[in-house]
């Protein structure tokens, strides 16, 4: 009982500290805006999936058609780069990623900063992911995203896929 009470107090305190930190969020949550309408590459910075792909990044590879966006997901498998073409359907906060019309992965946008340089998704499996725009990103927004990820994943281990020998880029 004491552990539950302590956890509740900690969570409440973290929420107050987060609210007072001056973080501006995108409201309402819109996955298409979080993906910058299909402009630019996003890197998976943090994931609660212990088997998250090393160096995972998503890059739009064609024109957006309404709320559908073709995306190439690239990751490092040992020393070899692998690229797979996915089709993302983005509607409100909902995200459905389909690989070659067969495999589907569902998720939900749970946090997005105002600049759309960083966002957090929660997959239907319960995995949390923090994605960051490749290139110039506002340090304050990234800090806000880091704080929110920490709040959402309190007590859950996570990996940092971009710290797995990603220095050499995929061709």
Swiss-Prot record:
Record's signal peptide: 1-15
The organism's place on the tree of life at top rank: Eukaryota
Transport in keyword set: no
Classification via InterPro entries: Calycin
UniProt keyword annotations, A-Z: Disulfide bond, Hemostasis impairing toxin, Platelet aggregation inhibiting toxin, Secreted, Signal, Toxin
Secreted found in the keyword field: yes
Primary localisation category: secreted
GO cellular component, one term: extracellular region
Cystine crosslinks: 23-144, 55-166, 118-145
One Gene Ontology MF term: toxin activity
Expressed in which tissues: Expressed in salivary glands.
Subcellular location per the Swiss-Prot or TrEMBL entry: Secreted
Post-translational modification: The N-terminus is blocked.
Main function: Tick salivary platelet aggregation inhibitor that plays an important part in the anti-hemostatic strategy of ticks. Acts by scavenging thromboxane A2 (TXA2), a potent inducer of platelet aggregation and blood vessel constriction. As a consequence, is a specific inhibitor of collagen-induced platelet aggregation. In addition, it also acts as a potent inhibitor of TXA2-mediated vasoconstriction. Has also been found to bind leukotriene B4 (LTB4) (which also derives from arachidonic acid, as TXA2) with affinities in the nanomolar range. It does not interact with complement protein C5.
Protein name in the entry: Moubatin
């Amino acid at each position: 009982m004491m552990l539950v009470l302590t956890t509740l107090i900690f969570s409440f305190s973290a929420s107050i500290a987060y609210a007072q930190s001056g973080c501006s969020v995108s409201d309402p949550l819109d996955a298409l805006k979080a993906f910058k309408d299909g402009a630019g590459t996003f890197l998976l910075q943090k994931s609660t999936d212990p088997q998250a792909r090393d160096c995972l990044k998503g890059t739009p590879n064609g024109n957006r058609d309404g709320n559908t966006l073709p995306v190439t997901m690239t990751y490092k498998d040992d020393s070899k780069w692998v690229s797979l073409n996915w089709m993302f359907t983005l509607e409100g906060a909902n995200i459905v990623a389909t690989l070659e019309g067969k495999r589907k992965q569902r998720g939900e946008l749970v946090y997005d900063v105002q600049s759309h340089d960083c966002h957090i998704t929660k997959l239907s499996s319960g995995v949390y992911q923090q994605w960051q725009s490749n290139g110039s990103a506002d340090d304050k927004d990234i800090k806000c995203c880091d704080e929110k990820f920490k709040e959402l994943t309190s007590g859950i281990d996570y990996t940092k896929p971009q710290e797995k020998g990603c220095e050499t880029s995929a061709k």
